Amino acid sequence: MQKIDANKIIDEAKFNPFHWMVLFWCALIIIFDGYDLVIYGVVLPVLMKEWNLSPLEAGALGSYALFGMMAGALIFGPLSDKIGRKKAITICVVLFSGFTVLNGFATNPTEFGICRFIAGLGIGGVMPNVVALMSEYAPKKIRSTLVAIMFSGYSVGGMLSAGLGIVLLPNFGWQ
């Protein structure tokens, strides 16, 4: 009976449309991930004025997402080994997208901070999983290049957040 080494097949594969699809979806998720993290900085001046926040309070409010990211990475990284990467990524995307949308309905800093923390769980949880997914499917010769391209989406998301904020914030407000 012949044995098949799946890792060897993946490592030696030629870059093909399947790899493009994995790269596209992972990069798109990272773009939204970057957008969701940076959007706080875009609305920060308005929030400070509207809620009369001191710089210290505003900084603390912003750090809740970072605490969530740390916890999310530690929770969803290992969890994906049990439930699968796609399920873990889906849960994380729902968390960071849903709670970022809910942030728009926050009426006070406490509600906003809770939403930022929970969104941070998804933001941090998606990171190790898209890296692992891209690494697992990428041919060995271009693995680090594909991960680097995918991660550049994080900066793209941040720039989109700032660019859209410049256009939308003056016309529609932060909510």
Report the location of each language-model feature.
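Transmembrane-helix signature of 12-pass secondary carriers
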Residues: 1-175
